[in-house]
Amino acid sequence: MNKAKTLLFTALAFGLSHQALAQDLTVKMTDLQTGKPVGTIELSQNKYGVVFTPELADLTPGMHGFHIHQNGSCASSEKDGKVVLGGAAGGHYDPEHTNKHGFPWTDDNHKGDLPALFVSANGLATNPVLAPRLTLKELKGHAIMIHAGGDNHSDMPKALGGGGARVACGVIQ
């Protein structure tokens, strides 16, 4: 009887811990200008990396820079006497200190560099993107940022892909 209980308990504990490890994360995204919600992004781990599945609305159509930022805050900060929306999120997640912007699948740049986010003509973003170098575990406590402009995955001709202003943000918890 005790052996059966032990086996049952072990099986349940393993099943629950395995389920907790595989659990997806949902990040609530907020428009930094208005403070209004714009939707969510679901993060899920698979054998290829982390999949970011947006369900976003009320964004400007086109391509947008899309990054993981260093800090888990979407608050504004001040830089050179000017308010920077989402500035408390810091720079792009760069644990190897490369100080270089690049493609999501190369190893010599920020790990927080994601594929650009596509927003349709009606302001919706629903197309998933894959980040092959990331894991869900390392993302907790960081911010997801959507920038006003596109991203050329280079520091030329403009630094950080030329994405510009920060328009929407969410904290990964």
UniProtKB/Swiss-Prot annotation:
Disulfides per UniProt: C74-C169
Catalysed reaction equations from the record: 2 superoxide + 2 H(+) = H2O2 + O2
Listed SUPFAM superfamilies: Cu,Zn superoxide dismutase-like (SSF49329)
Cofactor stoichiometry and binding remark: Binds 1 copper ion per subunit. Binds 1 zinc ion per subunit.
Protein EC: 1.15.1.1
Pfam annotation, one family: Sod_Cu
Signal peptide residues on this chain, from the entry's feature table: 1-22
KW Disulfide bond (keyword) present: yes
Name of the top EC class for this enzyme: oxidoreductase
Entries under PANTHER family matching the protein: SUPEROXIDE DISMUTASE CU-ZN -RELATED
Function (record text): Destroys radicals which are normally produced within the cells and which are toxic to biological systems.
Similarity comment: Belongs to the Cu-Zn superoxide dismutase family.
Name listed for the protein in its UniProt record: Superoxide dismutase [Cu-Zn]
Species of origin: Photobacterium leiognathi
Gene that specifies this protein: sodC
